[in-house]
C-alpha cells in the first residue's frame, strides 16, 4: 500500500506531527545557514518516489541485480545532466554525501599516509580537508594552509612556499566558509610545480559555478567533488566529476564496491530533476540573486563598526562576521537569533582564539532566503534585524519587535506556494 498524507497521519501521528512541526519551523524561520536551501516540490516528489524500493548495486549497464533497466535510465539522466552543467567528461552521481565523495576522491588519488595539503578549518576549510577528528586527518598526513593573517585572503605565494617544503602528493582546494573568489588555476600551477595532484571540493559554490558566476574548477582539478544541495539546490547528496578516464574508473570503484553498496536511486532521481532545474535559464537568475542578497546583507554589517566581516566582504553566497564586540561569542549569537526565529550557525574565524563550540564568529548565507524570493531590500532588513537582536539581547520588547518583523517577512515569502 502506498500511503497518502491522510493515511500517514492516521498510521503514525507522532512522526507526522514531528514533520509538520519542522515544516512550520521552516516556514516561520529565516534560514541563513549557508549549507541549507529550499528544494522544489519536484525534487521532494522524486526523492519520495517508488524508486526507494529498488536495489541497484553497480552502474548503468553493469548491475549486480536484475530489474534495473528503469533505474539505469534514471541514473543516466543524472549523469548526463551533471556532465552538461559542469562541462565534465565523467560524473559519478552515487555518493550519499559530500564527505563520501571526498573519501572516494582521496582513495582514487593517493594512498594512506601520503602527505596532503588542505585548508585550515578556521581559515574556511572543511572537516574532510584534514581535520584530526575526520577520517581524512586520521588516514592521511594532512598539512594545513591558512589565509593571510592580515587580509584573510588566500596567499598563493605562501601556499607555494609551503608546498615546496612539505612536498604533498595532493593539494585540496575549496572551502566551507570563505567568502571570496578562489583562483583554481593558481592552485593547479602550485600542484604542477611540486608534482602533486589537485582536488577541488566546490560543495558550497557549485550552484554559482553552474551559473557561470564563479570560475569553474573542473578544467584545472584532477577530481572535483561537490554536494548536490547548498547552492546547487538539490537533494542532500554528493557528486564527483573528472575529465580523466582512468581516474573515472578509480572513482567508480572507490564508491562501489569501495565505500558504498547500493546507490539510493530515489535520491539519484532527485539529483536528476534538480540538475534539470539548474539547466533552466531561471537558475542563473536565482544564483545571481543569491550573490546580490549576500552582498546586500554584508554591506549592512560593513557600515556598523561593532561588527567585522572576515576578509572585508563577500563575492559569493556567504560571509563570516566577528561578533565579539557585541556578544560574548558566536554560540551566544546563534542562540539569541534562534529565539527570534533567525537561524544561522556559529563559526570559527581565521586564527580563532575560542573553541569551535563557542567561536568568535557567525556564518551567514543567502541561498535559502533567495529561494524564497527575498530580494536585496529584504536581505538588508534581515541583516538589520540580526544587528538589532544582538545589540538588544536583554530587551524583551525589542526582541518581540524582531519576531514580529521576521513573521511579516516569512508570511510575505512562503516556503512553498499553495
From Swiss-Prot:
EC number: 2.1.2.1
Gene3D superfamilies assigned: Aspartate Aminotransferase, domain 1, Type I PLP-dependent aspartate aminotransferase-like (Major domain)
Cofactors demanded by this protein: pyridoxal 5'-phosphate
MF term (GO), any: glycine hydroxymethyltransferase activity
Annotated (6S)-5,6,7,8-tetrahydrofolate binding sites: 121, 125-127, 246, 355-357
Annotated site (Plays an important role in substrate specificity): 229
Domain of life: Bacteria
Pfam families assigned to the protein according to its UniProt record, in alphabetical order: SHMT
Modified residues (N6-(pyridoxal phosphate)lysine): 230
Pathway: One-carbon metabolism; tetrahydrofolate interconversion; Amino-acid biosynthesis; glycine biosynthesis; glycine from L-serine: step 1/1
Sorted UniProt keywords: Amino-acid biosynthesis, Cytoplasm, One-carbon metabolism, Pyridoxal phosphate, Transferase
Major localization class: cytoplasm
GO biological process, one term: glycine biosynthetic process from serine
Reactions catalysed according to its record: (6R)-5,10-methylene-5,6,7,8-tetrahydrofolate + glycine + H2O = (6S)-5,6,7,8-tetrahydrofolate + L-serine
Subcellular compartments: Cytoplasm
A GO CC annotation given for this chain: cytosol
InterPro entries reported in the protein's UniProt record: PyrdxlP-dep_Trfase, PyrdxlP-dep_Trfase_major, PyrdxlP-dep_Trfase_small, Ser_HO-MeTrfase, Ser_HO-MeTrfase-like, Ser_HO-MeTrfase_PLP_BS, SHMT-like_dom
Annotated function: Catalyzes the reversible interconversion of serine and glycine with tetrahydrofolate (THF) serving as the one-carbon carrier. This reaction serves as the major source of one-carbon groups required for the biosynthesis of purines, thymidylate, methionine, and other important biomolecules. Also exhibits THF-independent aldolase activity toward beta-hydroxyamino acids, producing glycine and aldehydes, via a retro-aldol mechanism.
Recorded family membership: Belongs to the SHMT family.
Assembly behavior: Homodimer.
Designated name of the protein: Serine hydroxymethyltransferase
Organism annotation: Streptococcus pneumoniae (strain 70585)
Amino acid at each position: 500500500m502506498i500511503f497518502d498524507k491522510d493515511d500517514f497521519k492516521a498510521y503514525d501521528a507522532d512522526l507526522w506531527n514531528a514533520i509538520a512541526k519542522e515544516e512550520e519551523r521552516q516556514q516561520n524561520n529565516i534560514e541563513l545557514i549557508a549549507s541549507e536551501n529550499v528544494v522544489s516540490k519536484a525534487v521532494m516528489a522524486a526523492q519520495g518516489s517508488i524508486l526507494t524500493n529498488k536495489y541497484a548495486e553497480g552502474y548503468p549497464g553493469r548491475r549486480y541485480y536484475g530489474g534495473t533497466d528503469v533505474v539505469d535510465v534514471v541514473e543516466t539522466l543524472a549523469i548526463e545532466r551533471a556532465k552538461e552543467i559542469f562541462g565534465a567528461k565523467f560524473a559519478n552521481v552515487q555518493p550519499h554525501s559530500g564527505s563520501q565523495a571526498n573519501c572516494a576522491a582521496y582513495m582514487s588519488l593517493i594512498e594512506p599516509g601520503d602527505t596532503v595539503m588542505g585548508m585550515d578549518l578556521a581559515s574556511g576549510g572543511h572537516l574532510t580537508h584534514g581535520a584530526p577528528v575526520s577520517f581524512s586527518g586520521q588516514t592521511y598526513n594532512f598539512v594545513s594552509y591558512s589565509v593571510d593573517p592580515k587580509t584573510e585572503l588566500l596567499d598563493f605565494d605562501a601556499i607555494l612556499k609551503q608546498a615546496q617544503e612539505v612536498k604533498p602528493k595532493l593539494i585540496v582546494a575549496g572551502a566551507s566558509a570563505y567568502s571570496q573568489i578562489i583562483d583554481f588555476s593558481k592552485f593547479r600551477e602550485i600542484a604542477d610545480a611540486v608534482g602533486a595532484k589537485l582536488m577541488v571540493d566546490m560543495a558550497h559554490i557549485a550552484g554559482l559555478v553552474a551559473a557561470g558566476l564563479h570560475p569553474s574548477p573542473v578544467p584545472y582539478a584532477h577530481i572535483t567533488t561537490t554536494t548536490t544541495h547548498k547552492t546547487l539546490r538539490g537533494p542532500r547528496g554528493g557528486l564527483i566529476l573528472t575529465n580523466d578516464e582512468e581516474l573515472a574508473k578509480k572513482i567508480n570503484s572507490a564508491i562501489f564496491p569501495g565505500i558504498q553498496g547500493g546507490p539510493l536511486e530515489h535520491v539519484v532521481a532527485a539529483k536528476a530533476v534538480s540538475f534539470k532545474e539548474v539547466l533552466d535559464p531561471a537558475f542563473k537568475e536565482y544564483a545571481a540573486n543569491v550573490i546580490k542578497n549576500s552582498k546586500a546583507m554584508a554591506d549592512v554589517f560593513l557600515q556598523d563598526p561593532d561588527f567585522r566581516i572576515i576578509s572585508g566582504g563577500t563575492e559569493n553566497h556567504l560571509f563570516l562576521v566577528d561578533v565579539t564586540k557585541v556578544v560574548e561569542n558566536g554560540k551566544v549569537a546563534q542562540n539569541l537569533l534562534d529565539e527570534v526565529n533567525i537561524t544561522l550557525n556559529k563559526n570559527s574565524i581565521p586564527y580563532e582564539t575560542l573553541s569551535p563550540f563557542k567561536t568568535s564568529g557567525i556564518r551567514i548565507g543567502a541561498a535559502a532566503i533567495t529561494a524564497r524570493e527575498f530580494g536585496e531590500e529584504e536581505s538588508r532588513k534581515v541583516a538589520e534585524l540580526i544587528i538589532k537582536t544582538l545589540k538588544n539581547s536583554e530587551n524583551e520588547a525589542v526582541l518581540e519587535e524582531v519576531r514580529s518583523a521576521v513573521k511579516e517577512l516569512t508570511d510575505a515569502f512562503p516556503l512553498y506556494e499553495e
